[in-house]
């Protein structure tokens, strides 16, 4: 796309794009002016040939791809045909653009035939040189191809469909072979300019016949070399819009038919009626269920007498009625008692247990336990009544101990009046207690003798605690 940006409004060209042609720029040939009458004659002849080409193109399209390939191979096999003699400057232009003769011949077969007429519309009797013609051809390539496609559209409907597929694939071909197509167009323009410059050479019937062969082959194999970004008034764009509009119209009609089927008011009415009918059926069904629910209690009440009328083989009917009345009375009594509030005393009363008789051994154990408890209580009272000693010396402690030991021995030997518990003791117990007391007296005597050695004792003044 950038190579077309060098074109200015007045037709001048930046020749940096054609750096590959600098070596041969000295071989430019001057352009000779041609009279308007010759140009008009050429244009009228070309228009007639275009009409013939359109008629023959219709027949060529109906023939298969096989016929076109055969014609193309036959054309290549005859390099010395009159068409090549009439288009003599083409090899020079092809050599100038850096292409071989075979490549030039292949691209010439794809050039549309409406180019001279388009040149008359855009260039009033102005014939530039070879470089200018190639640049103008690159600049005006889109309208030329568009005009040829319009001619093909008028000729046949099948060619339109083939041409649409060719246009869709031409954009990709243009991206790959942009520079090559520009060179081939320059070669074709130079050859066409040489034909129009020479007054002696006029288009003969053989050249027109060869052009018809080219047109027949190029109708279905035309290559679109237009730039990707084209103006909004492009004829090819309008052709594409026309082709797509027909498809859209057909699809819109189909969609309209579908939408009419979907949004048909009769269909909506049927749907509404069906919904109302379903609601009515549901309402009736609910009413029937409610009616059955009302009938069920009455049917249960009616079944009870039937059950009473049935004969009971165990009891008579009168006995059965009496039993049922008694059951009802008991049930009411139980419910009334359950309904009463509970008594204030929630704690249950202790049951009065009958006195149990014990064995003699158990009675003896209880009596012995009671005696031990009584002695313990007496000792506890004695200990509570005792005051602490005055001195803390060893002798004072020993004296206090002797006093206590004498008290214990005296109580063990002389029973208290009014109590015969000591005399009633068993011999084992009494002997055990006596042995303990005797050992205690012996210890007291030893301590007393040791204390007598330390200091003199006042035996006459000592008296027992209970005296």
From Swiss-Prot:
Against InterPro entries, the record matches this protein to: Cfap97/Hemingway, Hmw/CFAP97
Give me the stretches of Low complexity compositional bias. 180-194, 421-439
Region (Disordered) residue ranges read 1-20, 76-235, 336-370, 412-467
Organism superkingdom: Eukaryota
Using the record for this protein, list the coiled-coil segments as residue ranges, or answer none. Answer: 310-387
Q: Which UniProt keywords apply?
A: Coiled coil
Basic and acidic residues bias spans: 198-216
Q: Where is the composition biased (Acidic residues)?
A: 124-135
The record's section on Pfam families has: Hmw_CFAP97 (PF13879)
> Polar residues compositional bias: what residue ranges?
162-177, 223-235
Q: Which family does it belong to?
A: Belongs to the CFAP97 family.
Q: What is this protein called?
A: Cilia- and flagella-associated protein 97
Organism ancestry: Eukaryota, Metazoa, Chordata, Craniata, Vertebrata
Q: Which gene encodes it?
A: cfap97
